[in-house]
């Protein structure tokens, strides 16, 4: 059996970048994690991304069968994600040049996010191979769920996403809810959508012993016997950090002597975002002495944050799945999350955590108080959370994705030749 070779496209963020700040987040974790598992299954994966510094080198050999290829497209620094559409042609040209010079032939293209999808669409027509596309987020959904004052996604992005829905051979989504979103907002054909739940690294993210928890808290400078809430992710309005901080202020207004701490682990994302904005918010709310801000951490260190926490809060305005919620549960920590997007699948309400309707800080304070004050229920949820997370692994996700690639390759054999032979003037 011949080895399958996949060209993944992730133009706006490298899967090797530290998640939790800038444009690096759950998508980075998704791409590198599932690509590693595909490589271990014998699938060769090349991930094309835009070079952001000269020291990166053209090719990074991550492990056997997995490479990250850095393509120069525009200046290394100074371009925001919103400006990257100006470099799509340069990036596509760089991918084509690299593949030609190194005699690369691929079986399937898999693009991630709408910017990469535009490049993938072009490459599909050029290479005459099928395109699998994963949106990760959708403009129409983000706009429908955005918070007051948050920036609206552009109509140009929505149009590009519509083009990808209409032209990709297979669309991969995380949950059935995402399928519904594609059908509702983009008139997608549900038969062209494959649902593959992401996973968590359950070998790394494991429940710690009491000694692990105490050691983690000592390293973080947190008292051993206080109640701890953690927020992990980019500090941007859409992720809802302000919701959590205002909920904490509400809890302390009700009971100023409540013994608790909050860990905010992540960096700013977006042109106007700064950590100082949230630090100043804690000061204005009178809770600065209860909140500790941490820089983004690699997974090997992040597990200690999850283990140090009694509860992990995910107050996002939308999540296609919620990898932070799954990592926290794999670590044995219950989650309080917004009932949006894929979070009701990632978190089992009343069993592995609590889902909150809406983003009212008072409602969040109620939910957090109830869980923090009920030690037996919280401990029971922690045990159930580990069992639940065990059903979501990257190995299982990669097995399903490899099957999708096989289906796409068969589609190419059966249909793509006639389609392109009949009319390449469509491009």
UniProtKB/Swiss-Prot annotation:
GO molecular function: acetylglucosaminyltransferase activity; D-inositol-3-phosphate glycosyltransferase activity; magnesium ion binding
Catalytic activity reported: 1D-myo-inositol 3-phosphate + UDP-N-acetyl-alpha-D-glucosamine = 1D-myo-inositol 2-acetamido-2-deoxy-alpha-D-glucopyranoside 3-phosphate + UDP + H(+)
Enzyme class of the recorded protein, top EC level: transferase
EC number: 2.4.1.250
Positions annotated to bind UDP-N-acetyl-alpha-D-glucosamine: 18-19, 26, 234, 239, 297, 319, 327
GO BP term, example: mycothiol biosynthetic process
Pfam families, A to Z: Glyco_trans_4_4 (PF13579), Glycos_transf_1 (PF00534)
Binding-site residues for Mg(2+), renumbered to this chain: 306-307, 309, 333
SUPFAM superfamilies: UDP-Glycosyltransferase/glycogen phosphorylase (SSF53756)
Keywords, alphabetical: Glycosyltransferase, Magnesium, Metal-binding, Transferase
Binding site for 1D-myo-inositol 3-phosphate: 12, 23-28, 81, 113, 137, 157
Quaternary structure note: Homodimer.
NCBIfam families recorded: mycothiol_MshA
UniProt similarity note: Belongs to the glycosyltransferase group 1 family. MshA subfamily.
Function: Catalyzes the transfer of a N-acetyl-glucosamine moiety to 1D-myo-inositol 3-phosphate to produce 1D-myo-inositol 2-acetamido-2-deoxy-glucopyranoside 3-phosphate in the mycothiol biosynthesis pathway.
Protein name as catalogued: D-inositol 3-phosphate glycosyltransferase
